[in-house]
């Protein structure tokens, strides 16, 4: 043991008043930094501490030098005394009780970590690296290593961080309040990575709230536990520069994008029914998607959520990948593995609302902090959730920073923003009298509009490789147009009209389809009003809707033929593609989050044929610029047959500058049609590059023998083709 230094006589009182001792022991002292820790007393220094269970306390420097013996002021663990120091500095204590001895580094002897500029930018809402400042971060500070905790709770009387490291005692680590920003912070020395913690908050009324998880937590406990967990900074060795460079430098509207939508918890399961880890998913999902030709994987929300049947859409931890699949590093490895084989990763992201679980954001500091206080703006009647207050700069900053966090830290390629329509309209799912008009008397949520515009400006400004996709179900204009042109600034928008109209048409018996011909032609009137993604998503195979194959009419053969024809129709239609897992092999049953997909179906010819078709559609779509380069521009489309409602035949030409055109022809009746005359743009031989009725896909094998001949009859170029029943074919000129 090092020799104790001489302790100078302290002329000023180093003791603590009885009232302050009472407040410290009761956990009601709002600023223990003013009392505990090291303080100057005249020309000398004193140390005061609160160490429950201690009978004796010796003060030391961080390197172990003894600087004084402290006097017990209260039997519950309050000590104080003069210490031999020449300046304010952090100290450590050696505490004893009987034969037990332990060391405690004093959190109140450390200065603040955040600075005035952090306060300024946080309050202004322009801090774009809040995720490096807020939450829990392992740092070295004033010579010690530990966790810096920071949380926004401007209306709280007192905030403490509690966890495994202090026996969940809210009196031990009461945080320092930064009045300029409303942020509370504390550096907790010696706290390691991997420990659970929450915030204990005393509200405005002096009442303790339920313990709160960290809004900026980067890791959480596995449900049903709800605590946040201290996490190290990601140390992923990224090997994806070529992938990122490609998407930074290309016009995404002119690239092939075919998205495989995945619920990570139910794509596959282990034999015992438990969920796969990220590494297990990487070993199976990535090669599967690469083989299938999908360009992107879009995950249903993977941010931490407490309730499995919510599928992740009611998140309580926007910054933490859910613990269901392992640690955050596992997800980073998954993304890196995708990028190495050229597959992008899109996150389904939920900034519209949050659940009211008591450990979450609701009434976070005893007031409506993240949500509107008025339920007409702050409560969502459809989901019984709270709505973010988009008019509060700190809340907008929290959400924008979260989007930037996923793009920067995890190299995500896109964010699909959920429930945009519910954000845009003040009267969404509300009756008369249940909503508040905007300042102009309208139903537009102008604060949400500004948030979405700011979100897209920030994302594209800092991460041009990332794309944002809006799930917006109304006719709100210019969703995917630039902000400077009055748009919301999204890269793409889901085409809900396409999904609704085409599935409505396909569910009809073919004998009646002729009466509903316009359900398919109508969509081309607005197909280029936005940059569209055509979504056959999870929403279409849940809540009693059945699977896609189950929606098709007819006997089993006709159901499969209908779905094959529909898929090829969609892959030939202008717009990017999205297909929910299991639908690529025509799973019969409705999707359930509780179990894996019915992979056993692939042993059957018709299901394996469907999978092969989707695979071939993806590679055809990707390899033929005519099918993707003008997905979002009208010049890439030309009707060939638009009004043959009697035969339910549709045909069009897909085009791209300097590339061979592709003719897409669909027969939506079970009638085998020979010698069907169709106009084509050039004479000569046209090759059949895809036929959904091919035997390898489970079809009847009817077609055109691989090619057709277009003849120029006085300037009118036509060809006579065979249209298989319930089938789509694609043709391209040989020369």
Swiss-Prot record:
UniProt cross-references to SMART domains, sorted A to Z: Aamy
Signal peptide: none
Entry EC number(s): 2.4.1.18
Catalytic residues (positions): 418, 471
NCBIfam families: branching_enzym, PRK05402.1, PRK12313.1
GO CC terms: cytosol
Biological process annotations from GO: glycogen biosynthetic process
EC class name: transferase
Protein name: 1,4-alpha-glucan branching enzyme GlgB 1
Cell membrane recorded as keyword: no
Family: Belongs to the glycosyl hydrolase 13 family. GlgB subfamily.
This protein's pathway: Glycan biosynthesis; glycogen biosynthesis
Catalytic activity: Transfers a segment of a (1->4)-alpha-D-glucan chain to a primary hydroxy group in a similar glucan chain
Highest taxon in the source lineage: Bacteria
Molecular function per GO: 1,4-alpha-glucan branching enzyme activity; cation binding; hydrolase activity, hydrolyzing O-glycosyl compounds
The protein's role, per its UniProt record: Catalyzes the formation of the alpha-1,6-glucosidic linkages in glycogen by scission of a 1,4-alpha-linked oligosaccharide from growing alpha-1,4-glucan chains and the subsequent attachment of the oligosaccharide to the alpha-1,6 position.
Complex formation: Monomer.
Keywords: Carbohydrate metabolism, Glycogen biosynthesis, Glycogen metabolism, Glycosyltransferase, Transferase
Disulfide bonds: none
SUPFAM superfamilies linked to this entry: (Trans)glycosidases, E set domains, Glycosyl hydrolase domain
